[in-house]
Amino acid sequence: MPAYHSTFPVDPNTDRMVGNFALLPLNTKFRGPAYPSNSDYDIIDECLDLFRANSFFKNFEIKSPADRVLIYGILFINDCLAHLKITTSFNEAVKVLTNVALDNFTLPGTPGFPLNNVYQVPVQDHNSMDLLKTYIQQFRQELAMRLLERVYSSTDSKEYPSKFWLAFTRRRFMNKSL
């Protein structure tokens, strides 16, 4: 059974891209360079929907530039879940994941990023790298908040995270982590 791929169509001639990383529209309340999405379903929802199914795969064939955003999102979700514990309350989790989203992070294409063979970004072009950094930061912030909504939605009091989500902290998508 093959892995699930992104359903978002990306045209490299008309869509915004930095190297081969697509800057897809987001439904977000955080400030950043992402355009607002035309629909209720965006790449962040797709990352959250496909995370559990795709986390079992060690190989992933990239079929479109949107798949690269999906890969980054799945790796970031795994990183966020690794910072949560079964005893972490919702308010603590908001603080923890906000810090994780805003922490210094390596950009695709820079030394230290785990999947540099997948991403080809113009490291010498500082404007493009700044655009990519602010987009990824906006993406990480929104993804962390939506992840919290899903992880803490199954309990009535929003006091403790869902053990079914936390069970995926041991899984490594493509044997990589951010």
UniProtKB/Swiss-Prot annotation:
Location of the protein in the cell: Cytoplasm, Cytoskeleton
Gene3D superfamilies: Actin-related protein 2/3 complex subunit 3
Gene Ontology BP annotations: actin cortical patch organization; actin nucleation; Arp2/3 complex-mediated actin nucleation; establishment of mitochondrion localization; regulation of actin filament polymerization
Cross-link (Glycyl lysine isopeptide (Lys-Gly) (interchain with G-Cter in ubiquitin)): K29
Key words, A-Z: Actin-binding, Cytoplasm, Cytoskeleton, Isopeptide bond, Ubl conjugation
Assigned GO CC terms: actin cytoskeleton; Arp2/3 protein complex; mitochondrion
Molecular function in Gene Ontology: actin binding
Any Pfam family hit: P21-Arc
Domain of life: Eukaryota
Family that this chain belongs to: Belongs to the ARPC3 family.
Job description of the protein: Functions as a component of the Arp2/3 complex which is involved in regulation of actin polymerization and together with an activating nucleation-promoting factor (NPF) mediates the formation of branched actin networks.
Quaternary structure and interacting proteins, as annotated: Component of the Arp2/3 complex composed of ARP2, ARP3, ARC40/p41-ARC, ARC35/p34-ARC, ARC18/p21-ARC, ARC19/p20-ARC and ARC16/p16-ARC.
Note: Present with 1920 molecules/cell in log phase SD medium.
Protein's name according to its UniProt entry: Actin-related protein 2/3 complex subunit 3
Organism whose genome encodes this protein: Saccharomyces cerevisiae (strain ATCC 204508 / S288c)
